[in-house]
């Protein structure tokens, strides 16, 4: 399934595979993600203590976090989920949230933070367009921590379409890049 998606993405280039009859406005982006959590303190310790997000607001049943002063990039609440368990495998729902870092050094710093916290990593990949680290948060939500290469460096075929790549990244080199911060 993932390979099918990679093939579909590689053929899409930067032109949609299917254009909506009434396309959404260019420039629309995802402003924030709001997730249910079993434990506000536990997600606070991970997202603030390990990844380094700033707390914008904290209440007994909700937490709002930001990277760089936005009103919030991530929201968490226990309104319907306090003490709950993650959804079982084989059900629909969130696959992962990608957190994009501005530089390779910043992604290397994130990897260092995870290593320092002894946080388990599910995998890592160099996709050609970006490098990514995959992991699970305390509620078992999938996270992709990623750095996008400049678009001019993205791999393309002879017709100019994006090529999907999946290679093992040099994690030691990525960690060393954090020294540039």
Residue ranges and their predicted role:
Residues 28-38, 54-55:
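Mature N-terminal segment immediately following signal peptide/propeptide cleavage
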Residues 39-54, 113:
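Amphipathic alpha-helical segments
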Residues 52-58, 121-124:
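Short secondary-structure junctions
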Residues 32-34, 71-74, 96, 127:
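Histidine-centered active-site/metal-ligand motif
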């Amino acid at each position: 399934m993932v390979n099918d998606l990679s093939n579909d993405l590689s053929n899409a280039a930067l032109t949609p595979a299917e254009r909506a009859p009434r396309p959404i406005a260019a420039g629309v982006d995802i402003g924030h993600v709001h997730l249910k959590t079993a434990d506000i303190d536990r997600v606070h310790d991970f997202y603030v203590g390990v990844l380094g997000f700033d707390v914008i607001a904290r209440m007994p049943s909700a937490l709002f976090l930001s990277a760089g002063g936005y009103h919030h990039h991530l929201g968490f609440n226990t309104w319907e989920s306090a003490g709950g368990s993650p959804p079982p495998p084989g059900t629909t729902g969130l696959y992962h949230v990608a957190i994009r870092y501005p530089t390779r050094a910043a992604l290397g710093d994130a990897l260092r933070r995870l290593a320092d916290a002894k946080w388990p990593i599910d995998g890592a990949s160099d996709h050609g367009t970006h490098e990514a680290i995959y992991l699970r948060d305390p509620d078992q939500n999938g996270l992709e921590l990623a750095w996008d290469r400049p678009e001019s460096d993205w791999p393309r075929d002879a017709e100019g379409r994006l090529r999907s790549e999946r290679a093992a990244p040099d994690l030691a080199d990525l960690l060393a890049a954090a020294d540039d911060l």
